[in-house]
Amino acid sequence: MFLSFGLVLFHLAGTWSLPLIDRDEPRFAEASREMIQRADYVVPYFNNQLRLDKPPLAYWAQVASYRIFGESDFSARFPSAIAAALVALVIFAWSRCNGATSVGWWAAIIFTLSLQTFVHAKAAVADMWLVLFMTLAHWSGYELLSRSSRGTARQMPVRLGPVKPYHQTRWWLTFYLSLAFGFLAKGPIAWSPLLTVGATIILARDWQLARHLKLLRGILLTLAVVALWGIPALVQTHGLFLAIGIGRHVISRSLVTMEGHGASSFGMYLLLLPFYFVTIFVSFFPWSIKLPWLIRQLCRQKKAGIADPGYGRNQLDNYLLTGIAIIFVIFTLVATKLPHYTLPAFPLLALLLARHWQGATAITNHGSLFRKVAITSACLGLAIALIIPPAVARFFPAYQLFRESRPNLQPNMQFASVEFEEPSVVWYFRSRVQSFLNRVNKKNAVDFMSGPGPRFVIVPTSLVQTLFPNPPQTWTSFRTRGFNIAKGNQVDLTLVLKSE
């Protein structure tokens, strides 16, 4: 209980003072709000338009958070913090279940304090839910294999007693249900633990293990759970969820670069193949400083024929390495590349590093180094989370315009924007305005403001005098300067408001 509470508090630090970052965070947050407004929890919408990029589990979690805390930046991010804390608890429980509680503590700390976890545990996106269910699937898949192997003559774990059918069924259900919920979090990549389990069986050449997976029944269970949402979603969207969600955002993303993230040519694709093997040293920081040591340690043990440390002859190292390799290979081959795509491998990597690092403390002073790195990272993380967000909030243009104009906003207002259409505009202003954002060009902006009823438009400040040279005295304007993170450029915006 103490561990889980501390993890949640660590991840939540600063989430209330940093505005949502364009573009993904406001899209998720607003789509969840529109689920509530539309009373439709099957098909997500953003700004009254279908949003078919991701399955619904992250939206459902945010909806639950909104019900508890209300709609805010904090409540949009709260589910990710919970998911990240649960991942650490799963790693801890996995290790403790295998008789190594101290390794579990180390692994949970390593995962929690890695840079990519620090970022995404505070982000209003779906990634941490994917990581959670993939980690659960990897753990339960491992338990299925290791416990099933007690019926064979080789690789029989010495730590375990007789297998109870109840336990075997529990791990079987956990494995296939985790695959289902992982899919509902972020799509087919959640099924990669199937590849890990399959590859482990092939490498072990123990074909009797495959029988205990009950693969056909398990896949049917997974598909049945997904179908409870998927069939209504396909019916409501006339198949668009499959065409866009899988066709565009899975298949096309794998074959071609999307949104400028990745290679623009085949030559660049080849050049970027080592992308994740380089970015891991940033994403997994500060623990990446020990990765070269871990590689040398694994190589020495393989050459010496030393069995896995701590767990007898259960080959956990091989299982963890297989899972890590599969995730890295999949995303290495995918054309679209972002540093956080390999985040599902981090729990496995944290457990692998903790097993060997903690084991080495018996003959070295590495334990002292671990404590120093952990304490320093935790203190720096808290300082950054609590100090930086309030200092940079003024550079978020949509957030600042909303704060300044909030007393003048009315629920029945219409609103539009010219040349600044970031999702944060929709998220912040729709918390006070019931209508949806209209995207207009310079010519239509004047016509829009000439319409009946209260309304406002957001335009670049350089266009204000051209578009509205002689505004009525009853009109109000608000100006802000900031930084468009999505496009990487500075902006100077003015909100022109007509109250009646």
What are these regions (language model features)?
Residues 381-491, 497:
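Short periplasmic/luminal acceptor-recognition loop of GT-C membrane glycosyltransferases, typified by
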Residues 330, 334, 346-349, 353, ...:
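Hydrophobic alpha-helix feature that most strongly marks membrane-spanning transmembrane helices
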Residues 1-358, 426, 483-492:
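Membrane-integral, polyisoprenol-dependent glycosyltransferases
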Residues 339-342, 353-354, 363, 369-370, ...:
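Extended hydrophobic-aromatic, low-complexity segments
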Residues 234-238, 373, 388-389:
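A membrane-periplasm/extracellular boundary helix in multi-pass inner-membrane enzymes
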Residues 1-12, 378, 382-390:
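Hydrophobic alpha-helical targeting segments used for export or membrane insertion
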